[in-house]
């Protein structure tokens, strides 16, 4: 992700510091090629963020939620669930951007997405394989109740298929869309299924500074029990 961002920033700065964007040159073949390369770097940066938010960390998320399902370290699991929901918000933003480009919001970006399809699949595959290796590392000494490395690997493939389909790519992993290997993770990621007791969370509904300030000595003179 940082490499893609660096490439885009450096490329954009080179474009901005040059003169190809000026009216005298912007319609020349060289200028058109340069601006397209800037857009290509932008696409790769956004696509990498999409993969980051949509696939990476999900092995760790699932492990944290598994402890929560066992009533162990529930506080940590609930905090991690908030992080996962935040990731989902970022994911939705990048999906919206990519789908706008794919629909022709910018015709040149639509062309770039088609040209970069092979690269995009390679980035998805790289992220999936790295998450699988992390699952192997976490469960190198054995499994836990309800979770093991094999299930996690299937889960990562299932998520990757969903992420690819969401941006108009064909899913490549052999796992049915309806067969979530870890269905119990959904209520941790979705705010609809999670209940939090008041004593376990920060309550923000208290009235602050609600004391009546104009009380005088005779205010309660007519008060009787």
Locations of regions flagged by a protein language model:
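Non-heme di-metal
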Residues: 1-225
